[in-house]
């Protein structure tokens, strides 16, 4: 079994999650949730594209702290025209630790805290391979 090395989560002086390995913040300093909604959800027209379908598949490279996933999950849950099943596929070479998933973003408080906690509870071991977790 090949264990994956987690990214060592650090924080920049303003309190935003930072990856020393990649020399970058995990999300916009203007707010991760707003960025995910504007760039990922709206930028890809996801709610319009998944409307009234039986199922819909999203592929994301670089899961990070899961903000795009969490924003998508929240939008899917709140959408009366959502597909019956949403498949969110993501790849990550250096997954964070489950406890890192529960850290609220500095500018959004705990808007996604319930979803973060559910994700952290089911977060798989850091071993190479395919991992499947299911919600809702």
Question: What are the functions of these language-model segments?
Answer:
Residues 2-56, 64-82:
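Class I SAM-dependent methyltransferase Rossmann-like catalytic core
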Residues 57-59, 89:
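Conserved beta-strand elements of the Class I
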């Amino acid at each position: 079994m090949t264990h994956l090395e987690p990214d060592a989560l650090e924080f920049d002086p303003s309190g935003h999650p930072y990856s020393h390995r990649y020399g970058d913040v995990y999300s916009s300093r203007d707010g991760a949730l707003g960025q995910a909604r504007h760039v990922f959800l709206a930028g890809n027209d996801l709610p319009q594209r998944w409307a009234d379908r039986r199922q819909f598949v999203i592929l994301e490279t670089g899961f990070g702290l899961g903000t795009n996933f969490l924003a998508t999950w929240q939008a899917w849950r709140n959408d009366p025209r959502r597909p019956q099943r949403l498949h969110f596929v993501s790849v990550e070479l250096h997954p964070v630790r489950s406890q890192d998933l529960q850290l609220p973003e500095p500018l959004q408080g705990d808007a996604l805290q319930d979803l973060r906690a559910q994700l952290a509870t089911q977060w798989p071991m850091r071993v190479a391979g395919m991992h499947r977790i299911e919600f809702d």
